[in-house]
Amino acid sequence: MSIEERVKKIIVDQLGAKAEDVKPETSFIEDLGADSLDTVELVMALEEEFDIEIPDEEAEKIATVQSAIDYVQNNQ
């Protein structure tokens, strides 16, 4: 699975979103109804899946599907 596919799967699993709703421009909060706890859990799942550390100030910037994919690709 590609990084993009793995990130999308985590988003579907963590937020209960439909796979077809998880597009690059999709916002976790505005489009998928995530709250701040959901986004924290999402970041933790990304850290675990990709064995990376995402500092809080960086985690706050991860608000869309594409921003999550970009962060993982740039920090692996």
From Swiss-Prot:
Residue numbers bearing the O-(pantetheine 4'-phosphoryl)serine modification: S36
Pathway: Lipid metabolism; fatty acid biosynthesis
Main localization, broad class: cytoplasm
SUPFAM superfamilies found in the cross-reference section: ACP-like
Limits of the Carrier domain: 1-76
One BP term from GO: lipid A biosynthetic process
Coiled coil: none
Molecular function terms from GO: acyl binding; acyl carrier activity; phosphopantetheine binding
GO cellular component, as recorded: cytosol; membrane
Post-translational modification: 4'-phosphopantetheine is transferred from CoA to a specific serine of apo-ACP by AcpS. This modification is essential for activity because fatty acids are bound in thioester linkage to the sulfhydryl of the prosthetic group.
Role description: Carrier of the growing fatty acid chain in fatty acid biosynthesis.
Similarity remark: Belongs to the acyl carrier protein (ACP) family.
Stated name of the protein: Acyl carrier protein
Organism: Glaesserella parasuis serovar 5 (strain SH0165)
